[in-house]
């Protein structure tokens, strides 16, 4: 970790009280840099407000509740990710996660129809995500994880997708679009609004499997969705700071926020992620007020309406 850059004191102060809405902590089936409790303790030391635990494979609301008990100064929030490990588009899984205190529902990630890399035979030497290695290992062991559809062949959301959206609306949870493709994102967002979902966030819109243009991002922001720009993907060289900042300038900062998406052992410490991003934004010419909105205020506005 000593090889990673250190955030400035100015950036640390600007992100004080922030929520990181997308982190990968242990225990997990994929190796992580810290466990939930260690992460909460580090957030407390840095004056950060809270974080959402993401697992591609299991609900995290129970882990979050225990972490809040042990580190009450930090609001640790749980979630569920609708991959095959929880039954895919499974409204019962969402209902149980909500009753256990979950704050956020990610739509499919590793099992999204839009993410075939984990279902294809691996290409020797290819640079693939950590989770894709897990998918390949499972297939080698005869455990098949098929794609989770959210729309039909005509692009209309499936009945089970609407049932999930109704459960999200009922419990006032946050909907995150995860690894859906562009057309799926628009279909799901429009259906979510029809079903009464109040909080929607578009997960890493610049990520190659989403690749939303600036006009697309603006159209989603006009619908009331937040745009979650993730820092880990920049470190993994999936896209650049310049692209993200250009898109934010196009859409305006009101519906944009940054999350780290950190927790991978090769990456910077989770608790440094937002401050490192704030330093980049300052260097790119954003004002302190704008940086505070992008890295703290907007994520708090999204998170503080959640039940946990």
Task: For each feature predicted by the language model, list its residue ranges.
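Metal-cofactor-binding active-site regions of metalloenzymes
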Residues: 2-17, 61, 71-92, 104-117
């Amino acid at each position: 970790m000593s090889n990673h850059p250190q955030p400035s004191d100015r950036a640390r102060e600007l992100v004080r009280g922030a929520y990181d809405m997308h982190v990968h902590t242990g225990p997990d089936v994929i190796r992580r840099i810290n466990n939930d409790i260690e992460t909460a303790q580090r957030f407390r030391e840095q004056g950060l407000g809270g974080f959402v635990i993401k697992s591609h494979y299991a609900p995290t609301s129970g882990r979050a509740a225990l972490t809040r008990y042990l580190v009450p100064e930090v609001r640790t929030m749980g979630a569920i990710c609708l991959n095959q490990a929880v039954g895919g588009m499974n409204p019962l899984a969402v209902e149980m996660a909500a009753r256990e205190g979950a704050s956020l529902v990610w739509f499919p990630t590793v099992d999204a129809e839009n993410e075939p890399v984990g279902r294809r035979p691996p290409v020797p030497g290819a640079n693939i995500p950590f989770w894709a290695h897990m998918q390949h290992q499972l297939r080698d062991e005869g455990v098949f994880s098929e794609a989770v559809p959210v729309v039909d062949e005509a692009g209309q959301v499936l009945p089970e997708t609407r049932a999930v959206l109704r459960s999200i609306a009922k419990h006032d949870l946050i909907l995150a679009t995860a690894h859906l493709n562009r057309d799926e994102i628009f279909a799901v967002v429009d259906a979510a609004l029809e079903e009464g979902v109040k909080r929607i966030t578009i997960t890493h819109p610049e990520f190659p499997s989403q690749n939303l243009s600036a006009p697309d991002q603006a159209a989603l922001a006009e619908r009331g969705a937040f745009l979650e720009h993730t820092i880990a993907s920049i470190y993994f060289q999936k896209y650049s700071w310049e692209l993200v900042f250009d898109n934010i300038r196009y859409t305006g900062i009101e519906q944009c926020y940054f999350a780290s998406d950190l927790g991978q052992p090769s990456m910077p410490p989770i608790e440094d992620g937002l401050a490192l991003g704030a330093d980049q934004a300052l260097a790119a010419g954003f004002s302190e007020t704008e940086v505070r909105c992008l890295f703290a205020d907007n994520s708090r506005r999204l998170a503080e309406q959640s039940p946990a």
